[in-house]
Amino acid sequence: MIDQLKAAGINFLAVDFDMTLIDRHTEGRWSGTASELLRHVRPEMRQLLRDALDAQMFVAIVTLSPQTSLIREVTRLLYPKDFQLIIIRGNDGNWFYGGQGSSRGKQPHIASAVEELSHAHAAQISRRSTLLIDDDAQNINDALVNGVNAILYAPHDPSCLQRGVAALGEA
């Protein structure tokens, strides 16, 4: 799948957390541990992010959850050697995006992550080289309207990911 993403010009994955990376909707109020939440990571998403990191693609988790410390701990448990490479943008009040881009949906989260990656790694990321994977149709629509590639993740159909990636190459 990574080869297909690279062939489509994708170098940055922005992935939603609730109901996309994990199979639960925490509503930003998970009271359990990161280890307990780790059991809810979808195998296909775990592998996609592992492969993306191995291929030196940029990765961010973009979420409306304010529980970014918990999400950071989940990424540390998932990828102990590479978790620090994953940017996390949630509604925790710890970041600000003041650019000219869209403020709808996950767009400011993505733009803020791109700013950090550009400063920290001299990353060359554009809207066309970005892929949002999210289970929320409105977030997907907001991305597409703004020229960002997007795949609507269907929680009960994990193969939608492979089909979505294949469709990127056809566009």
Q: Regions from the language model: what does each represent?
A:
Residues M1-F58:
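Active-site neighborhood of HAD-like aspartate-dependent phosphohydrolases
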